[in-house]
Amino acid sequence: MPHSYDYDAIVIGSGPGGEGAAMGLVKQGARVAVIERYQNVGGGCTHWGTIPSKALRHAVSRIIEFNQNPLYSDHSRLLRSSFADILNHADNVINQQTRMRQGFYERNHCEILQGNARFVDEHTLALDCPDGSVETLTAEKFVIACGSRPYHPTDVDFTHPRIYDSDSILSMHHEPRHVLIYGAGVIGCEYASIFRGMDVKVDLINTRDRLLAFLDQEMSDSLSYHFWNSGVVIRHNEEYEKIEGCDDGVIMHLKSGKKLKADCLLYANGRTGNTDSLALQNIGLETDSRGQLKVNSMYQTAQPHVYAVGDVIGYPSLASAAYDQGRIAAQALVKGEATAHLIEDIPTGIYTIPEISSVGKTEQLLTAMKVPYEVGRAQFKHLARAQIVGMNVGTLKILFHRETKEILGIHCFGERAAEIIHIGQAIMEQKGGGNTIEYFVNTTFNYPTMAEAYRVAALNGLNRLF
């Protein structure tokens, strides 16, 4: 006789991964509950990560755009906004996103339970509710989508009012004149752009030898130059020895012997999975040193009835990929296999000012692979649309095979890069002979548009062939 469970599946976490899994499961007729530890759904992406930081960035970039526009640059009407004002804008966006996502669950009759989940045995969860009570829930299968949080080294005092991580920075109540950012990954670079755009002095401490080393080197160099040109001080190959919080700021002692002082510190060097409270040892699961779980191609953990998606499994740690991982896991959970798979070339969007976005292979990788490729470039400053709106900083680069004309990689630096990249991605994903750079020469683009950069870059690249 089959065992009777409260639910077919329980999803732990309501971020993009949890939402993708829950929606995928209910659409297939499964009885699903979603456990969320906070009062509102959306996870870290909505409340502390993607949404608020991008809302901040947008507000700051619009202020920069206004102040740099020659129509308004008589210095009598320069825009100024406090960090608190800009955070209010982010809060409005968060509230809209929360209401929308709450509606998804309600319309699909997906039960949401608030509390902290922990495993009791292979099919049982204990739910510690906000009122102090404990509920017991059973399910045949589980999806762990509990996300991640900023990594906190034990020798840094995050209780100090001037030491922030990428979550607590959203609660900053003072106006810093000088910010230290430790960690020059995606989060560190994005906040360096935001603070510098608000005319705050920024010291960016990079533990590596160049910014965002996973990017095509030309894009990384473009960002480095843009930071240098805007006044961001970048210190490469540095690690902290000691961090001291004091009444008027923070002092950082570097292993190289340097000392830096600023009004506050943003520590943005890595993230860790939110798995420590799940009591995974009770079901025989182990995490790595950063609290992340290993999964197979169908997002199953070492326990076949337990799946994991999103930040808790590490790379690529993107909201967009997490949602797709959730949908794929839901299909595998119900049917035993998934026909859908995560695409091979996942686009990356980095919301610095200006943006960086890429899809496919870099020049460095193609050179190492000994692939005969060619490069086509378009500078934004040569596009009519960019000249009209004053977006002269930026470039689009297309890498393609010299013989087959197949597009191998696309890299973009400039405003709207994360939108522009998808035009090229759509052609790259075409099967058969559909993936060819000649498409951009043979199609007609609206004029004037930023999309026209593809035609300019394609012609530039094809003209290099002989």
From Swiss-Prot:
Catalytic activity: NAD(+) + NADPH = NADH + NADP(+)
Compartment(s) where it occurs, according to its Swiss-Prot or TrEMBL record: Cytoplasm
Main location: cytoplasm
EC code(s) of this entry: 1.6.1.1
Domain of life: Bacteria
Residues annotated as binding FAD: 36-45
MF GO annotations: dihydrolipoyl dehydrogenase (NADH) activity; flavin adenine dinucleotide binding; NAD(P)+ transhydrogenase (Si-specific) activity
Keyword set, alphabetical order: Cytoplasm, FAD, Flavoprotein, NAD, NADP, Oxidoreductase
Family matches, as InterPro entries: Class-I_Pyr_Nuc-Dis_Oxidored, FAD/NAD-bd_sf, FAD/NAD-binding_dom, FAD/NAD-linked_Rdtase_dimer_sf, Pyr_nuc-diS_OxRdtase, Pyr_nucl-diS_OxRdtase_dimer, STH_gammaproteobact
Enzyme's top EC category: oxidoreductase
One Pfam family in the UniProt entry: Pyr_redox_2
Disulfide bonds: none
Co-factor(s): FAD
Cofactor binding mode and count: Binds 1 FAD per subunit.
SUPFAM superfamilies the UniProt entry points to: FAD/NAD(P)-binding domain, FAD/NAD-linked reductases, dimerisation (C-terminal) domain
One GO-annotated biological process of the protein: 2-oxoglutarate metabolic process
Role played: Conversion of NADPH, generated by peripheral catabolic pathways, to NADH, which can enter the respiratory chain for energy generation.
Assembly: Homooligomer; probable homooctamer.
NCBIfam families tied to this protein: PRK05249.1
Stated family: Belongs to the class-I pyridine nucleotide-disulfide oxidoreductase family.
Name assigned to this protein: Soluble pyridine nucleotide transhydrogenase
Gene it is expressed from: sthA
